[in-house]
């Protein structure tokens, strides 16, 4: 359960990085 929680948080951070920072780079 702990491992799954860690992976979910890591995945969410990566998604935020790509969709947040990435979109700002492409669309600004």
UniProtKB/Swiss-Prot annotation:
Keyword tRNA processing: no
Keywords: Host cytoplasm, Host cytoskeleton
Keyword DNA-binding: no
GO cellular component, one term: host cell cytoplasm
Subcellular location(s) of the protein: Host cytoplasm; Host cytoplasm, Host cytoskeleton
Function: Plays a role in the reorganization of host microtubules and intermediate filaments to form a cytoskeletal cage that surrounds the viral factories, protecting the site of viral replication. May play a role in viral infection of human cortical neurons.
Note: Product of an upstream open reading frame of the genome polyprotein gene. The initiator methionine is coded by an unusual start codon CTG.
Protein name (record): uORF1 protein
């Amino acid at each position: 359960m702990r491992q799954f929680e860690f992976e979910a948080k890591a995945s969410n951070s990566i998604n935020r990085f790509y969709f947040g920072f990435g979109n700002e780079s492409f669309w600004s």
